[in-house]
Amino acid sequence: MISSLNGILEASGKDWAVINVSGVGFRCYMPATSPALIGGLGQRVRVFTHLHVREDALSLFGFATTEELSLFETLIDVSGIGPKLGLAMLSVMNAEALASAIISGNAELLSTIPGIGKKTSSRIILELKDKIAKNWEAGVLSQVTEANSDILATLTALGYSSSEAAKAISSLGDNGDLPLEERIKLALNYFNNK
C-alpha cells in the first residue's frame, strides 16, 4: 500500500522517525541504525516502507535501502518472527551481515540476537537459507566458508560491503588454524594495505 515515503525528516529516535510528506507526518519504526543513515533533521529523505496491518493497528516500518526492506519482509514470513522481532534483528546486525549469517548457516551468531534462541535461529536458517541466497550476492558470499562467516559478519557490521569483505577474506588464504581475532586483524590489514 505505502511502498516509500519521500519528505522532510521531522523527528527521530532510537528506532523510529517521523517523515513529513506534504504536511502529513508519518511515524515509521526503523532498525536502530537507519535514522542516522537516512539523513539529518530538516533534510529531505526517502524511506522504503512496509505497512503491517493487524485488526487493531496499522504500523509502518521504514528502511534506508530496498535490500533491508526485502530482507525484513522475508524474515517476517518465518513462523514466530513478527515485525518487531524482524526489526530487532536488523537493529543488531546490518542487512548484509544478517543475510550472510543465514546463508552460511551460522546459528550461533543468529542466536546472539535478543529474542532469537537456538531453535528459532535453526528454523530461520532452514526456511530462508535458499531463499536469501537467491536474492543476495550469492556468488560472492558462497566463496566464504563457514569458518570465516564470523569474519564476514564482523566486516559488514563495520560498514564494508559483502563483496569487499569477501575479497578481504579471500586474501587470508588458509589461516583457519589462527584464532578468530587474528583472522579479523589480518582481514582488516587487507583494507589498510589497499
Curated annotation (Swiss-Prot):
Region feature Domain III, mapped onto this chain: 149-194
Keyword terms, alphabetized: Cytoplasm, DNA damage, DNA recombination, DNA repair, DNA-binding
SUPFAM superfamilies: DNA helicase RuvA subunit, C-terminal domain (SSF46929), Nucleic acid-binding proteins (SSF50249), RuvA domain 2-like (SSF47781)
Domain of life: Bacteria
Domain II, as annotated region: 65-143
Region (Domain I) location: 1-64
MF terms in GO: ATP binding; four-way junction DNA binding; four-way junction helicase activity
Subcellular location: Cytoplasm
CDD domains xref list: UBA_RuvA_C
One BP term from GO: DNA repair
Pfam (any one): RuvA_N
UniProt KW DNA damage keyword: yes
Flexible linker, as annotated region: 144-149
InterPro entries, alphabetized: DNA_helicase_Holl-junc_RuvA_I (IPR013849), Hlx-hairpin-Hlx_DNA-bd_motif (IPR003583), NA-bd_OB-fold (IPR012340), RuvA (IPR000085), RuvA_2-like (IPR010994), RuvA_C (IPR011114), RuvA_C_sf (IPR036267)
Cellular component per GO, a single term: cytoplasm
Sequence similarity: Belongs to the RuvA family.
NCBIfam families in the record: ruvA
Job of this protein: The RuvA-RuvB-RuvC complex processes Holliday junction (HJ) DNA during genetic recombination and DNA repair, while the RuvA-RuvB complex plays an important role in the rescue of blocked DNA replication forks via replication fork reversal (RFR). RuvA specifically binds to HJ cruciform DNA, conferring on it an open structure. The RuvB hexamer acts as an ATP-dependent pump, pulling dsDNA into and through the RuvAB complex. HJ branch migration allows RuvC to scan DNA until it finds its consensus sequence, where it cleaves and resolves the cruciform DNA.
Subunit structure: Homotetramer. Forms an RuvA(8)-RuvB(12)-Holliday junction (HJ) complex. HJ DNA is sandwiched between 2 RuvA tetramers; dsDNA enters through RuvA and exits via RuvB. An RuvB hexamer assembles on each DNA strand where it exits the tetramer. Each RuvB hexamer is contacted by two RuvA subunits (via domain III) on 2 adjacent RuvB subunits; this complex drives branch migration. In the full resolvosome a probable DNA-RuvA(4)-RuvB(12)-RuvC(2) complex forms which resolves the HJ.
Domain comment in the entry: Has three domains with a flexible linker between the domains II and III and assumes an 'L' shape. Domain III is highly mobile and contacts RuvB.
Identification of the protein by name: Holliday junction branch migration complex subunit RuvA
Upper lineage: Bacteria, Bacillati, Chloroflexota, Dehalococcoidia, Dehalococcoidales
